A protein has these predicted regions:
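Loop-helix junctions at membrane interfaces
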Residues: 1-164
Length: 164
């Protein structure tokens, strides 16, 4: 019972940290690409650390909650992207946890996430009419930058993990 409480408290702490990091963009105005790569990498690192630290797939709840925060902050223009991003985050976290012992498989996690986000975003864009510029920007944001931020997040999480 004690271990369950510890895991729950750790999970809540990681969720709070992720939401605070996600809110940096509200306090410190960064250019779009810097915002995406910097904050995205930090959030990916927190998601990875949360699942490694708690040793539980329950940590994937963080990946499901973060897109709601992004929508409420005005970072997502469509509410329909919340489940797409949540699914991508949860699959990314589960993949990285499952294959944490294999570096090659570990770094396939960002590819899985980018594939889900890119495919899901394009499905949403096919259903919802948006100006071309907005649609292209969303498609771009959900493509290769997700691979970069995912890999950087894994590296950052590994550095922090070794110091814990």
């Amino acid at each position: 019972m004690q271990d369950r409480w510890k895991a729950s408290v750790r999970l809540a702490s990681f969720l709070a940290l992720a939401l605070v990091l996600q809110s940096i963009r509200l306090v410190v105005p960064l250019p779009g690409p810097v915002n995406m790569f910097f904050i995205g990498s930090l959030l990916n690192a927190v998601m990875i650390l949360s699942i490694w630290q708690t040793r539980s797939y329950r940590a994937c709840i963080i990946g499901l909650i973060l897109p709601m925060g992004a929508f409420l902050q005005g970072q997502l223009p469509l509410v329909f992207l919340i489940p797409v991003i949540g699914l991508g985050n949860a699959c990314f976290m589960a993949w990285v946890y499952r294959f944490r012992r294999s570096r090659a498989a570990l770094f396939a996690g960002p590819l899985v996430k980018a594939g889900i986000l890119y495919g899901g975003t394009n499905i949403v864009l096919a259903i919802v009419a948006l100006p071309d510029v907005v649609g292209q920007t969303l498609s771009f944001m959900m493509s290769w930058p997700q691979i970069v931020t995912g890999c950087v997040g894994i590296v950052l999480a590994g550095i922090v993990w070794r110091r814990l």
